[in-house]
Amino acid sequence: MIDAEKNNSPLDLSYLRDMSGDSAEFMIEMIDMFKLQTPLYIADLEQSIVAQEWDKAAGFAHKIKPTLSYVGREDARGHLQLIENSARDLKDLSDMPKNFQEFSDFVQILYRQLDEAKAELEKRL
């Protein structure tokens, strides 16, 4: 589940750091790509939930999950796993709108954290 304490901490970008050989330029590109693609994936997830297309919802949640690990928010990955499992197994579907809204609200916090991380990385260029 989403760990609210991590919302006010700097992101753990160790995965990106390792993957990029500590290249600030590459990490900035990955952050920019995340911020460009994620809203599209989230919109697809929301549309599938509203339309009650549970197979699609499970697929979109699954697609977003790994990207959260890249930016150091493994905790939110667990929240998406809950959404994916509920959609795939057709369980607790009445909780789906609430669970989606919690994730959507979290993403706004994550974007702020990514902006802060990017600003720190830009100092290294």
What do the predicted segments below correspond to?
Residues I2-S9, K35, T67-L82, D89-L125:
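Amphipathic, coiled-coil-like alpha-helical segments
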